[in-house]
C-alpha cells in the first residue's frame, strides 16, 4: 500500500477503536495476538461508553465519509446478518454531503455528451436541485422540444475515492475472515456485494435501463408513474429524464390539503408492490420516502410517482412460488408448511430438522398472530422469520433481502398515510389469484407448451449430453483431489501467518516498553515486528 492508503487505513482503524467497535467481536473469538495488539494501542480507547453499540457504529460510519455511510445503509438491509439493534440504528444513516461546484457539473456533462451545454439544453441551472454522495441533480430544458428535465451527474473524481476505500475494506474483511474462521457474517462476500452495488450506482446507463423497464411495465397505469428517460442523452456518468412535480409521499399535511384519498393511495402502494413482484418479477428496490411522490392530479384517483431506479430486484418463477406459498402459510399459521418450504427451496440447508425449525417459528410468530390482522406488520413477520432462519444457517438470498427491505418501506409509507391499513387484506386476494394461475391443469399445460420447443431441440442430442456429463463427473473427481491438496497448503500458510502476526505483535509491544532505556534494541525489535507483520499479511492475502 502507498503512504496515502496507510494513512487512510490508520484513520479507519482509529475511528473504529475510538468508538469501541472492537467490542463487537466477542473476546473468545479474538486470538491472543489480536488481544495483545489491541492492548498496545492503549491511546485509542472507547470515548463513547455511554452510547449503545448501534449508535457508536452509526457515528463511526458517519465520521468515515460517504463510502462508509452507503455501506452502513446497505448493511441495515441485511437483517439476515446483523442483530436487530445494529440494523435499526444503521437504517438511520443519512446520505448528506455538500454539493460540488455547478461549473464542474457543467464540464462533466459536456465531456460525457461531447457538446457544449448550450447546444443541447436551455435554462441549465448550475445550482443543484439535490445532492448525494455519488451524484447530484440539476434542472434544465431540452432544446429539441422545450421539455423540462433533470440531469443527474456523477461526482467528479469519486471513483478513486471509492476504489481506495473498497480496497482497504476488502483487506480488513480478509483479516477478519482469517482471524475468525467460519464467520457467519462472511465479511469478504459482504464487501464484494457492496462493491458491485456501488459500481452499479456509478453506471447511470444501468439506472436508465431500469427506469425504462419499470415505465414499460406500468405504461398507461393509473397506479404508478415512472418519468420518461431521454436515452439519447444518457451516458455512464450522465442521466437525463423528465422532471416531475408531485407531493412528497411523507408530507401527509400537503396530501390532505390537496384532497388526496389517503386510504386508496395506501392500498395502491401495496398493489403496486405485489404487481411488480408477482406479475413482472422486476421491482423497484429503493422506495424510501425520498424516492416516492404523489401526483397533484386526480386526488380522488391518486397515482404514485417513483424515481431513482438505481437499485432493482428480480425473482425467478420458483422464488415467486415459494414466496407466495410462504405468505399464505404464515397467515394460516401453518408453520410446518413454512419450515418445509424453506428446506425445499434451498433457503436453509437440506439437513435442517423440520420439526425444530417449525417449533422455533411457532415460538416467535404465534405471539404476533395473537393480534388482530390489521395490527400485524407484514415486514415485521419477515424480519422475525429471517432472524429465526438465521439460527438454522439460512443461506443469504440477495433478492429476498431486497424484497424484505422494499416491503418494509411500502408498509411504513402505507401506515403513515392510513394507519388502519390492513396490508394482509389488500395482499391476500392478489396472492390467491396468482397462486390459482400457477396451479392446476391450465398452468401445467401452459408450462408444457413453454418447454416443448426446448425439449424438441434437445432430444436428438441426449446421448451426447449423457456422455459429456459422465466425462465431466470423472474430471471433477480429479479436481476435488487437487482442491483438497490446495486446502492443506492454505491451512499451513494460515498457521504460519498466525505465528508471524503474533510474533510481530509481541515484538511491537516489547519494543514500546524498551524504547526509553534501550533505543537501539527497540528499533531492531520494531523493524523485525514490521517484517513479521508484512510477511503475515502477505500470507493472508495470497490465494
UniProtKB/Swiss-Prot annotation:
Pfam family, one: ABC1
Protein residues bound to ATP: 129-137, 152
Source species, domain of life: Bacteria
The keyword Ribonucleoprotein is assigned to this record: no
The EC number(s) this enzyme carries: 2.7.-.-
Domain Protein kinase: from-to ranges: 123-500
InterPro entries attached to this UniProt entry: ABC1_dom, Kinase-like_dom_sf, UbiB, UbiB_bact, UbiB_kinase
Broad enzyme group: transferase
Membrane topology: Multi-pass membrane protein
Keywords of this entry: ATP-binding, Cell inner membrane, Cell membrane, Kinase, Membrane, Nucleotide-binding, Transferase, Transmembrane, Transmembrane helix, Ubiquinone biosynthesis
Localization per record: Cell inner membrane
Gene Ontology CC entries for this record: plasma membrane
Membrane-spanning residues: 499-519, 521-541
Pathway(s) per entry: Cofactor biosynthesis; ubiquinone biosynthesis [regulation]
A GO molecular-function descriptor: ATP binding
Location of the active site: 286 (proton acceptor)
Primary location group: membrane
Protein role: Is probably a protein kinase regulator of UbiI activity which is involved in aerobic coenzyme Q (ubiquinone) biosynthesis.
Family in the record: Belongs to the ABC1 family. UbiB subfamily.
HAMAP family: UbiB (MF_00414)
NCBIfam families, A to Z: PRK04750.1, UbiB
Protein's UniProt name: Probable protein kinase UbiB
Organism: Tolumonas auensis (strain DSM 9187 / NBRC 110442 / TA 4)
Amino acid at each position: 500500500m502507498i503512504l496515502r492508503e496507510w494513512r487512510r487505513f490508520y484513520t479507519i482503524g482509529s475511528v473504529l477503536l475510538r468508538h469501541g467497535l472492537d467490542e463487537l467481536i466477542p473476546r473468545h473469538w479474538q486470538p491472543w495476538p489480536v488481544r495483545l495488539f489491541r492492548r498496545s494501542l492503549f491511546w485509542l480507547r472507547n470515548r463513547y461508553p455511554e452510547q449503545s453499540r448501534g449508535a457508536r457504529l452509526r457515528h463511526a460510519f458517519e465520521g468515515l465519509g460517504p463510502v462508509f455511510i452507503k455501506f452502513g445503509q446497505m448493511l441495515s438491509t441485511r437483517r439476515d446478518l446483523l442483530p436487530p439493534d445494529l440494523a435499526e440504528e444503521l437504517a438511520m444513516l443519512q446520505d448528506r454531503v455538500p454539493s460540488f461546484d455547478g461549473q464542474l457539473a457543467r464540464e462533466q456533462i459536456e465531456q460525457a455528451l461531447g457538446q457544449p451545454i448550450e447546444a443541447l439544453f436551455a435554462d441549465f441551472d448550475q445550482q443543484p436541485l439535490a445532492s448525494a454522495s455519488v451524484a447530484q441533480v440539476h434542472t434544465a430544458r431540452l432544446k429539441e422540444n422545450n421539455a423540462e428535465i433533470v440531469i443527474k451527474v456523477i461526482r467528479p473524481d469519486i471513483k478513486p475515492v471509492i476504489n481506495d476505500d473498497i480496497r482497504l475494506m476488502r483487506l480488513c474483511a480478509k483479516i477478519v475472515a482469517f482471524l475468525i474462521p467460519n464467520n457467519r457474517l462472511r465479511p469478504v462476500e459482504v464487501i464484494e456485494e457492496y462493491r458491485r452495488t456501488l459500481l452499479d450506482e456509478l453506471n447511470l446507463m444501468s439506472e436508465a435501463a431500469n427506469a425504462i423497464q419499470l415505465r414499460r411495465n406500468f405504461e398507461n397505469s393509473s397506479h404508478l408513474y415512472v418519468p420518461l428517460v431521454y436515452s439519447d442523452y444518457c451516458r455512464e456518468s450522465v442521466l437525463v429524464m423528465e422532471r416531475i412535480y408531485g407531493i412528497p409521499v411523507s408530507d401527509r399535511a400537503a396530501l390532505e390539503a390537496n384532497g388526496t384519498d389517503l386510504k386508496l393511495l395506501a392500498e395502491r402502494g401495496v398493489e403496486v408492490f405485489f404487481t411488480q413482484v408477482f406479475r413482472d418479477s422486476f421491482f423497484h428496490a429503493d422506495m424510501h420516502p425520498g424516492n416516492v411522490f404523489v401526483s397533484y392530479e386526480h386526488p380522488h384517483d391518486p397515482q404514485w410517482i417513483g424515481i431513482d431506479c438505481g437499485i432493482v430486484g428480480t425473482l425467478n418463477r420458483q422464488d415467486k412460488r415459494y414466496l407466495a406459498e410462504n405468505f399464505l402459510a404464515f397467515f394460516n399459521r401453518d408453520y410446518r408448511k413454512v419450515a418445509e418450504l424453506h428446506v425445499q427451496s434451498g433457503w436453509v440447508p437440506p439437513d435442517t430438522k423440520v420439526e425444530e425449525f417449525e417449533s422455533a417459528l411457532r415460538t416467535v410468530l404465534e405471539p404476533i398472530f395473537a393480534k388482530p390482522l390489521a395490527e400485524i406488520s407484514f415486514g415485521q413477520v419477515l424480519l422475525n422469520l429471517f432472524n429465526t432462519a438465521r439460527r438454522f444457517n439460512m443461506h443469504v438470498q440477495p433478492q429476498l433481502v431486497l424484497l424484505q427491505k422494499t416491503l418494509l418501506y411500502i408498509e411504513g409509507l402505507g401506515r403513515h398515510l392510513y394507519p388502519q391499513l390492513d396490508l394482509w387484506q389488500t395482499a391476500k386476494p392478489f396472492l390467491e389469484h396468482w397462486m390459482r394461475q400457477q396451479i392446476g391443469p391450465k398452468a401445467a399445460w401452459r408450462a408444457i407448451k413453454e418447454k416443448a420447443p426446448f425439449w424438441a431441440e434437445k432430444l436428438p442430442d441426449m446421448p451426447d449430453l449423457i456422455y459429456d456429463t459422465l466425462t465431466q463427473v470423472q474430471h471433477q473427481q480429479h479436481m476435488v483431489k487437487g482442491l483438497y491438496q490446495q486446502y492443506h497448503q492454505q491451512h499451513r500458510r494460515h498457521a504460519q501467518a498466525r505465528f508471524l502476526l503474533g510474533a510481530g505483535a509481541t515484538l511491537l509491544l516489547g519494543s514500546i516498553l524498551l524504547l526509553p532505556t534501550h533505543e537501539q534494541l527497540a528499533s531492531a525489535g520494531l523493524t523485525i515486528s514490521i517484517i513479521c507483520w508484512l510477511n503475515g499479511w502477505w500470507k493472508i492475502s495470497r490465494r
